[in-house]
Design a protein with these regions (language model features):
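Accessory alpha/beta interaction modules
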Residues: 2-175, 185, 248, 303-306, ...
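Upstream accessory/linker segments immediately N-terminal to the RecA-like ATPase cores of bacterial MutS
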Residues: 164, 171-187, 192-203
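Short, charged alpha-helical interaction segments and adjacent helix-coil junctions
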Residues: 2-32, 36, 55, 88-90, ...
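Pocket-edge structural micro-motifs
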Residues: 142-145, 180-181, 225
Length: 310
């Protein structure tokens, strides 16, 4: 049985991701590496299965549950993480697949560690918390645009292993996978999937293998892009982008007004030097401009003003 759980994105997540996706909207095309399209497609069980099948190198992989935007709570019941895409296969393995385009904003290695622990929380809270043997295997995958390890591989797989004894594995059931769209070194079908995600069209010359799973994935992407639900998503992205633009414009207008008021107050005591004028007009911090405005109101001269704000 497949469960498609669609949870509305929190406003701050939409604001962060919509600004990135707005560029794609203006260009008229989304790729599978774009947050909104990735979520919309991964809701589909077949698409989710095909992506995981290629990543894991398991052509016969079968899923029994599929979720997108699932919120995982910590032990105290507080929200901890929101998983982009999560699935469970028929053997009980848990998969979390994250599209992570902006790797410079966070430490992906430590994020994977944090996610790993929290994914076990629902199992431990189910009443069998003292029986750790019930913890299912978990596979966390981060799909990135850049190579965070710098070794030019399309796929990096990490499991716990003893440093003193070669080939002695901890076998704690945890696996962390990092996929890198910038490399062509890896299994041809996986490289083709990553290149398809990066530039989502079968005409992409970087697609080395027209695997049936990629072909099927492309059909689903086409269906999603033609759906009413996707049109609603596009409109939401546009709306949030416009709201953010209006907010930025309003803030910019207020800042310009404050800067002009500061200059007018200073000019009451004499001409303002070009250096000071430029400093005031170039300032974009609203709080700092408010402080300067108060200082200008109390200052008897430009020099007095500068001494108050320095």
């Amino acid at each position: 049985r497949t469960t498609e759980r669609t949870m509305p994105m929190t406003q701050n997540v939409w604001e962060q991701e919509a600004v990135k996706d707005l560029v794609q909207l203006e260009e008229g095309e989304f790729n599978l590496c774009d947050f909104a399209l990735f979520l919309s497609v991964m809701k589909n069980e077949t698409a989710h299965r095909n992506v995981l099948s290629i990543i894991m190198g398991e052509k016969d992989l079968e899923l029994k549950e599929v979720h997108v935007e699932e919120v995982i709570l910590n032990r105290s019941g507080q929200r901890a993480i929101r998983l982009d895409a999560r699935a469970t296969d028929i053997s009980g393995r848990n998969f979390a697949t994250e599209m992570q385009n902006d790797t410079e904003q966070d430490d992906m290695r430590r994020r994977a560690r944090f996610y790993q622990g929290l994914m076990d929380t629902p199992v431990l809270k189910s009443g069998r918390e003292t029986r750790y043997k019930y913890l299912p295997p978990t596979i966390i995958t981060f799909i990135t645009q850049k190579d965070i390890f710098g070794k030019d591989l399309a796929k990096y797989t990490f499991t716990e292993q003893c440093e003193e004894i070669k080939d002695l594995h901890l076998e704690d059931g945890t696996t962390k996978i990092f996929l890198n769209m910038s490399s062509k070194n890896g299994e041809p079908v996986l490289v083709s999937l990553l290149q398809y995600m990066k530039h989502t069209t079968l005409e992409n010359p970087e697609i080395l293998v027209k695997d049936e799973r990629i072909m099927q994935l492309n059909e689903i992407v086409t269906e999603v892009k033609q759906s009413e639900e996707w049109e609603a998503v596009r409109m939401s992205i546009l709306s949030i982008g416009l709201e953010r633009g209006e907010k930025i414009g309003l803030e910019k207008g207020l800042n310009q007004g404050k800067a002009q008021s500061i200059l007018e107050l200073l000019e009451e005591s004499g001409p303002v030097t070009m250096k000071t004028r430029k400093m005031i007009l170039d300032e974009t911090d609203a709080e700092r401009l408010s402080v300067w405005l108060k200082a200008a109101a109390r200052a008897g001269s430009e020099a007095d003003f500068l001494s108050k704000i320095c």
